[in-house]
Each structure stands twice: as C-alpha cells, then as structure tokens.
C-alpha cells in the first residue's frame, strides 16, 4: 500500500465516522423537535454532503481515473472533478462558519437580540440555555440594555421559544420591563424583519446566538436592514459543534440556491 492509498484509507475512516456521528445527533434532534419535516430535509442535505466526502476519500484510495477503458477513464475524471469541486465548496463554508464562530465585537448598546432555538421535547436545548446565560451576563454589564427575545416556533403545548426564554430569564431575576418579545416569526429571516419594526435597525445592536450560528445570523440581520451589528457568540457544546457547523453549511447553501 503506497502513501496515497494509506491517506485514502484514513480519509474513508474519517468520512464514515463523521457520517455516523452526524446521523446519531440529527436523528436524536428530529425525534425531539416539533419541526420534524424541516429538520429531516436538512439532514438529507447533510447526508448528501457526507456522500461527497466519502466519494472524495474513495477517489484518493482507489483512483477513479485508473480504468483502462477510455469511456470509463473519462467518466472517472468527470466524477473526480465534480467531487473535488463540491468538497471544496463544502470545506470553504465549513471554514468560514468556524472562523466566524470566534469573532466577538461586543460593546454597550441600547438593544440586544437573542435568537431562539427549537425546543426539544418542550424544553430549551443546552445551546439555548447557553444563549440565555450569555444574555444575562451582558445585561448585568449593561444595566440600560433592553433584550429582544425572538422565536415563534411553538412546542406541542403552544409555548414559543421567545416565551420560554422570557420565563427562564424572569426566574433568574431579570425584570420583564427589560425584555421585549418577537414571538411571531418561524425563521431567522422573519425574526429580524419583525424585530426591525420593534427597534431602529440603524442603531447599534448586540446579536446573541450560538457561536456556530453567528456567521449566518449576521448575514441575515444585514439583509433585514441592521447596519451596526455587534457580535456576542454564546459557547456551544464541543461534542455537537461539528454537526452544528454542517447544519449551518446546509442552511447557507439552501439560502443561496433557493433564496430562502
């Protein structure tokens, strides 16, 4: 076995392992949320992306262009070019989102927006709790700031993400006159559109969301008219970070291709 074949073998193991890891996390989430159809659609996109990673690894290991027959050789080259291009696009977005997760430009502001996250079995997910932890600490540092809690997706009982966040912050002693709800929107884009009607989008605003979500959240906020965005990423689980980044990649590509 030569060096290329050894590298290909390692890549195959990594690609298959990542696919299994991603599948375990996503299947658990799909079973826990109300928005099963939306989550299942993105999961299918993720599996397609993983298939390209596996094909890339197989090409490195076995070589798609090694066939003796000319037709098969041309087909091998076409497949290789497609796989390499798709893999390069995926890696570009993975890198962009990962780098964006580390950027923090926090500063005092009149308003701060906390983005919601789908409830799991009627309870806030760990990453949503982390967003609230980050928001609470920011409020303590900035006593004049108003917090806009967004998220209109209800659980099975009808409670929205925004309402759940308000109740949790109230339990922590945050006064309700410092909290404003945007509980009508079911997408991040509509969250910002509705919030732009509640506050002046030309004023500086702090954006609080999970670190892996910041890249897409900032782009969406800018498209809704917010021009002075201060980024405050909330830490997320290291175990599921890879799956979350892949989720964001699929949503960004979905937006680019279908304009959503």
Task: Give, region by region, the residue ranges found by the protein language model.
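Helical transmembrane-bundle signal
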Residues: 18-22, 86, 90-93, 251
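A structural signal for short, hydrophobic/glycine-enriched beta-strand patches
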Residues: 92-247
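A transmembrane-helix-recognition feature enriched in membrane-embedded lipid enzymes
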Residues: 241-260
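Transmembrane helix-loop junctions and nearby membrane-interface residues
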Residues: 23-33, 91-94, 98-101, 256
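Membrane-embedded alpha-helical segments of integral membrane proteins
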Residues: 6-63
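Membrane-water interface of alpha-helical transmembrane segments
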Residues: 2-12, 39-43, 69-83
